[in-house]
Amino acid sequence: MIISAASDYRAAAQRILPPFLFHYMDGGAYSEYTLRRNVEDLSEVALRQRILKNMSDLSLETTLFNEKLSMPVALGPVGLCGMYARRGEVQAAKAADAHGIPFTLSTVSVCPIEEVAPAIKRPMWFQLYVLRDRGFMRNALERAKAAGCSTLVFTVDMPTPGARYRDAHSGMSGPNAAMRRYLQAVTHPQWAWDVGLNGRPHDLGNISAYLGKPTGLEDYIGWLGNNFDPSISWKDLEWIRDFWDGPMVIKGILDPEDARDAVRFGADGIVVSNHGGRQLDGVLSSARALPAIADAVKGDIAILADSGIRNGLDVVRMIALGADTILLGRAFLYALATAGQAGVANLLNLIEKEMKVAMTLTGAKSISEITQDSLVQGLGKELPAALAPMAKGNAA
């Protein structure tokens, strides 16, 4: 199979993976409207083509939180990576490290902090949820700090799990889920051999380390689902801000006023994100939400963004809309499921090449030159006319 884009990795991953795993990463909440709009809205953002600009000394390098990045991209937190490739978190982290960009370990990773951190030279980032069990949160933070994690990504848009209907149909949840998953696994031999047999243990490494016993998918659905905390407020984050020494990023911002609150709180960064369309269907796509948020807080706080980004052109679009750096999610997971570390490495090379093409043809020699001026104006403020009413309606 020829791999020329993330979409090729998606098709390959669908063939390799048992349906419960493919649809878990590929699906979204409710009718998946926001999941679709994340991709479609971003694809409609029009860039200005510029010519005869002497682009021979183009550079993608940037700096974030005093870290040098080879390009304004990081691998975002994705749960259960180790179910998609053998010790998947380690493989993805190694690919990111080799490319000179950060890797973010999820709270609900298969590989624990202590397995991933020593496998790479660059300090990794760590993502944490707000859970009722504050003892687990403190334990995870202490272990992340001891492992040398540099940046904390604090996810706040999951006070309760989203309604993901695909999961019930695919076997991730629903009636007879365990038996359905087993039958799917044995009919997908490549995955069964590489991950099912040779990728063990399949427990949730960070949670097992705290509970002192093996965990699995039932704990992911049960213990974790019962521990999300709908009572969370900004005040609950204060002890974390005091405890954590490094940069703290608030993930799950879609409204300018919440972005301003993050600045007032003292966060170092925010992630403009709707959780990849996996939480509340019908909310703004990240591409729609980003311009108003950038208007509100650009320069006061680092702005990261995710959701809907599938290639290097999308990265350039997001930066033009106001992001400083973007996080990859599904795109790298498709590649990981298809070809492990080599797949993620190839995807990052593709994204870098696509960014260079987009920057060359828009006349931006550096990341700092990708601005609102890189967008076609007159179609609506920073967005095509079809998107502008939503963006204006969300301005605060």
From Swiss-Prot:
Substrate binds at Y24, Y129, R164, R278. GO terms for molecular function: FMN binding; L-lactate dehydrogenase activity. The active site is at H275. It is found in: Cell inner membrane. Keywords: Cell inner membrane, Cell membrane, Flavoprotein, FMN, Membrane, Oxidoreductase. The keyword Cell membrane applies. The keyword Transport does not apply. GO terms for cellular component: plasma membrane. SUPFAM superfamilies: FMN-linked oxidoreductases. This is L-lactate dehydrogenase. It comes from Escherichia coli O81 (strain ED1a). Belongs to the FMN-dependent alpha-hydroxy acid dehydrogenase family. Its EC number is 1.1.-.-. The gene is lldD.
